[in-house]
């Protein structure tokens, strides 16, 4: 079964989110999963015991957690543990009012360059605002507004960058996957049309030279 036309040239939102949720993020566990060594004399069943055992494909950090000692896990697992009350999520260093203000200032002062944000910044911000709002030190409503301001500033520059689009080249460095995904159908469509126009012009020129 063929994909719908709108999904043939882009990722769906769910696909983008799936990719992002496999990225690592720092958490503060509220549980201990690290094996506890007990002395032989202390209990009849000597050896190691585990308070919690979580099953996942990459279980080293997950099954060696110590309560209130930071560690890194995949974002999807961090969100699951957060939902179950087993951890708090440490917000990324770039997701603060001060840092977002710095990014916004850069975007406004540099008309032809984009701030060097993480490739997944929009999705990360959306997921953490939605599912871990109480883990931020800064007010979430202000952070949301800053993210929106940053997004709008970058969208304006993307629109200007598309004015320089040709049939073979478009360079817009430091765009996130979501931003590229949004502009890709339009950009690819325009480049295909320009390529057809150039090919037709070349054919006409060759025909004229052969007359």
UniProtKB/Swiss-Prot annotation:
Its main location: nucleus. It comes from the Eukaryota. Keywords: Chromosome partition, DNA replication, Nucleus. InterPro entries: GINS_A, GINS_bundle-like_dom_sf, GINS_Psf2, PSF2_N. Gene3D superfamilies: 1.20.58.1020, 3.40.5.50. Pfam families: PSF2_N, Sld5. It is found in: Nucleus. GO terms for cellular component: chromatin; CMG complex; GINS complex; nuclear replication fork. The keyword Disulfide bond does not apply. GO terms for biological process: chromosome segregation; double-strand break repair via break-induced replication; nuclear DNA replication. The keyword Plastid does not apply. Belongs to the GINS2/PSF2 family. The GINS complex plays an essential role in the initiation of DNA replication. Has a role in chromosome segregation. Component of the GINS complex which is a heterotetramer of SLD5, PSF1, PSF2 and PSF3. This is DNA replication complex GINS protein PSF2. It comes from Eremothecium gossypii (strain ATCC 10895 / CBS 109.51 / FGSC 9923 / NRRL Y-1056). The gene is PSF2.
């Amino acid at each position: 079964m063929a994909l719908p036309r709108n999904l043939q040239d882009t990722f769906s939102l769910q696909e983008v989110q799936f990719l992002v949720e496999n990225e690592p993020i720092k958490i503060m566990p509220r549980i201990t999963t690290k094996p506890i060594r007990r002395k032989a004399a202390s209990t009849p069943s000597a050896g190691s015991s585990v308070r919690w055992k979580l099953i996942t494909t990459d279980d080293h950090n997950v099954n060696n957690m110590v309560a209130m000692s930071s560690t890194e896990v995949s974002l999807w697992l961090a969100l699951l543990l957060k939902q179950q009350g087993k951890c708090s999520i440490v917000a990324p260093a770039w997701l603060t009012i001060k840092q977002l203000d710095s990014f916004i200032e850069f975007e406004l002062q540099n008309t032809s360059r984009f701030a060097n944000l993480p490739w997944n910044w929009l999705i990360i911000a959306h997921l953490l605002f939605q599912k871990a709002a109480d883990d931020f030190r800064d007010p979430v409503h202000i952070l949301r507004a800053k993210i929106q301001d940053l997004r709008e500033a970058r969208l304006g520059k993307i629109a200007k960058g598309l004015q320089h689009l040709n049939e073979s080249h478009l360079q817009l460095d430091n765009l996130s996957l979501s931003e590229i995904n949004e502009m890709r159908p339009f950009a690819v469509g325009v480049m295909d049309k320009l390529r057809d126009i150039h090919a037709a012009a070349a054919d006409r020129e060759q025909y004229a030279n052969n007359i």
